Every structure is written in C-alpha cells, then in structure tokens.
C-alpha cells in the first residue's frame, strides 16, 4: 500500500471516530489549536509517515480496533487546563429531541434579583437562611431605638421584649387616667392629677361647714327630746340605717357586674368594671364603722339644742359616698371632693370627742353617769323647752 493510500485511509478513520465520539474530538481540538500536541498524536503521525504495522492492521480489524488502540495510547491522565469538563456518563442515551426540548428558553424580561440561577440538584445542597430569623444583638436594637423618632419608637420595639403588665396595674391606671387621653411621659400629667386631687379636698374643706350650717339653720325639723344617754344612742343607731343605703346599693351593683362580666372566679383576673365597685364597697364599710362610732360618742356630749346634727351628719355621709362613687367610676381626680365630705366630718367628730373627754369632762371619760350638759345650769328645763312649729 502506498503512502497516499495510507493517508487517505487514516483520514477516513479520523472522520468516523469524530462522528462516533464527539467529546474526544472536542478534547483534541483545543490542543491542536493551542499548538501543543500530545504524545499520542506524534506517534500517530510518525506511524502514518513510516507505515507502522499498527496502522496497517487497521483495515483488517475495522474501526473498533482503531478506537481500542486509541484508548491505549499513552495520553496524560490529567485534563488540560484549557479543556472543557467531561460530560457525565449516559449522555449518549439522551436523544437530540430531549436536548432541544430541555434547552433553556431565553426570556426577553430581565432576570429578577432573587431568581435562582443554580441547578435544581445544586439548590438542594444549600440550606436557605432567613436573615430576619437571626437574633439581633441588643446593642443594635438600642442604637435603632435611639435613632428612631418619637413616632417610630413603637415600630422598632421587638415583640419579645414587651412584658405584659399585671391586670391590677392596668385597671388602676385606667381609673386614675381618663380614657381617650394619652400621656407623652413628660411627667406633667402626674403633677396635674395631684394638684386636682388636693384642690378637690380643699373645696370639700370649704364646702363642708357651709353645707352643714345651712342645713342646720334652714331645714324645718328638730331632734326629739333625748334626756338620757341610752335614748341618744338609740336615736343615733336609727339614723345610721339611712347611711347604709349607698353601701347596699354598691353591693347590688357589684354583684351585677360580677354576673355581666363573668368574673365569678375569686382568684381570676380582676376586671376594671368589677374592681371599681368592690373597692367602693370596701372603703364605704370601713368609713361607715369609723364614722358612726364617733357619731355615737358625739351624741353623748352634744346638748339638746344641737342634737339636730346627728341626722344631718348621717345624710352628709350618704350623699358624699354617692358623689365619691360617681367620680371614682368615671376615673376623675375630682373624686377627692366626695372623699373629703366623708373624711373631714369624721376628723371633726374625732377632735370634738377628744376635746370633751380630756378637757371638758375628764371625770366622765370611762363612766356612764349623766352629762353636765343636761343639768339645769347648762340647758333649759323641760318646761322651757319649746319645739319649733315644724318639729
């Protein structure tokens, strides 16, 4: 076989090999373009020029023998740096139709920033991390809290730091602060509330003696003749029955509030609508005991002409407790006026009783003898006593 025929045969075999194995051709192609030739290529060229027996046996064995011999050539195992990556196994089984169908369709729309450009298998190897779930450091939270304006402070406050207030504090603040008003935390609201409370007590201090004197002078009734101490005590106790009216009314409202707001559990969460009436009833009972204890002692020292004060003080107690209940329910600081109308008469009676016990009649402090105020030299006799026309 002549040399031209051998070269033609080699060219035919090269074309068949390139058709059956395109990856090998692509691998060899960059090497030829780069100017570097592998040792296998040199041996192939030398054999073709000299007419080696390996090439001569090619036509007898067929193209398969040529591929096997090419596989046994002493090529380097390391891939060339400029060579592309080898294709995965099984690529020959994929038909051209599937490759065309799986080809990515270029969309005219620009890619989004959050679009996933990685293959599906690669995405599975990564675990997504939500930056919002990472706990921030307390220093960063403080910085943001300081930099935020007064209207934005509530937005940067994390939910996990908001500690719920106890229910007792909630309804107590709701009672002191009227609903619908917001406090900016400047501290002036507390001073105003205290000033209003003091002003209401001072108003009660001025209004209490004027009201008592006007009722004593202008109301058309007189107290009955009560010469003995026992009769005065009985009269005082009978007047005290009328003073229990606001307390009993408070108990009824308290029971209805328990039913309406389903607060029947004794150790459950207290509600503002229920606690208002409960505190009013408890405070009224305490003041009633102190008030009428001093009123009973006062009845033993008053002269006959001034016994009219007993029913007047009883009515003042009932009216003042109703005023306090109303102002306490609406959450006004002016409730000190109603409390002052109850506490100031109690304080005045206590001072009067101590004065008579230690100054006027110290010998009768612990005795049950008749008072000097009922003797002829202190009061009028029974014959001189003339009740008023309306008494």
Swiss-Prot record:
Keyword line: Golgi apparatus, Lysosome, Membrane, Transmembrane, Transmembrane helix
Disulfide bonds: none
Chain segments annotated as transmembrane: 201-221, 241-261, 280-300, 310-330, 340-360
UniProt region (Disordered), positions on chain: 1-96
Cytoplasmic domain ranges by topology: 1-200, 262-279, 331-339
Top-level division of the source organism's lineage: Eukaryota
Location in the cell: Lysosome; Golgi apparatus, trans-Golgi network; Membrane
MF annotations from Gene Ontology: identical protein binding
Side Extracellular, residues: 222-240, 301-309, 361-391
Gene Ontology BP annotations: cornification; cuticle development; epithelial cell maturation; establishment of skin barrier; hair follicle morphogenesis; positive regulation of epidermis development; regulated exocytosis
GO cellular component: cytoplasm; lysosomal membrane; trans-Golgi network membrane
PANTHER family: TRANSMEMBRANE PROTEIN 79 (PTHR31004:SF1)
Main function: Contributes to the epidermal integrity and skin barrier function. Plays a role in the lamellar granule (LG) secretory system and in the stratum corneum (SC) epithelial cell formation.
Protein name in the entry: Transmembrane protein 79
Native organism: Rattus norvegicus (Rat)
């Amino acid at each position: 076989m002549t040399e031209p025929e051998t070269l033609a045969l080699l060219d035919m075999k090269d074309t068949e090999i390139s058709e059956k194995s395109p990856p090998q051709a692509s691998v060899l192609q960059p090497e030829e373009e780069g100017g570097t030739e592998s040792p296998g290529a040199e041996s192939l060229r030398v054999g073709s020029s000299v007419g080696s027996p390996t090439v001569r046996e090619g036509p007898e064995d067929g193209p398969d023998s040529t591929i096997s011999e090419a596989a046994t050539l002493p090529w380097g195992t390391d891939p060339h740096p400029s060579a592309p990556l080898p294709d995965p196994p099984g690529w020959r089984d994929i038909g051209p139709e599937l490759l065309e169908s799986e080809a990515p369709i270029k969309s005219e729309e620009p890619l989004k920033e959050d679009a996933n450009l990685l293959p599906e298998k690669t995405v599975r190897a990564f675990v997504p991390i939500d930056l919002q779930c990472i706990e921030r450091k307390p220093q960063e939270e403080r910085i943001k809290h300081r930099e935020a304006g007064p209207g934005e402070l509530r937005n940067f406050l994390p939910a996990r730091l908001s500690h719920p207030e106890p229910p007792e504090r909630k309804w107590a603040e709701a009672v002191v602060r009227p609903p619908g008003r917001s406090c900016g935390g400047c501290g002036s609201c507390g001073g105003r509330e205290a000033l209003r409370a003091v002003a209401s007590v001072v108003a009660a201090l001025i209004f209490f003696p004027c009201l008592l004197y006007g009722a004593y002078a202008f109301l058309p009734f007189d107290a009955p003749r009560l010469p003995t101490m026992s009769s005065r005590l009985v009269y005082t106790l009978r007047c005290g029955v009328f003073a229990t009216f606001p307390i009993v009314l408070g108990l009824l409202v308290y029971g209805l509030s328990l039913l309406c707001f389903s607060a029947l559990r004794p150790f459950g969460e207290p509600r503002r609508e229920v606690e208002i009436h409960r505190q009013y009833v408890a405070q009224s009972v305490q003041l009633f005991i102190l008030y009428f204890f001093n009123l009973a002692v006062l009845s033993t020292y008053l002269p006959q002409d001034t016994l009219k004060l007993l029913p007047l003080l009883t009515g003042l107690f009932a009216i003042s407790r109703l005023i306090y209940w109303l102002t306490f329910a609406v959450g006004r600081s002016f409730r000190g006026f109603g409390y002052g109308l109850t506490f100031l008469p109690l304080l005045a009676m206590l001072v009067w009783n101590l004065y008579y016990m230690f100054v006027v009649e110290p010998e009768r402090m612990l005795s049950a003898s008749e008072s000097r105020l009922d003797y002829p030299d202190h009061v009028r006799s029974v014959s001189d006593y003339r009740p008023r026309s309306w008494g």
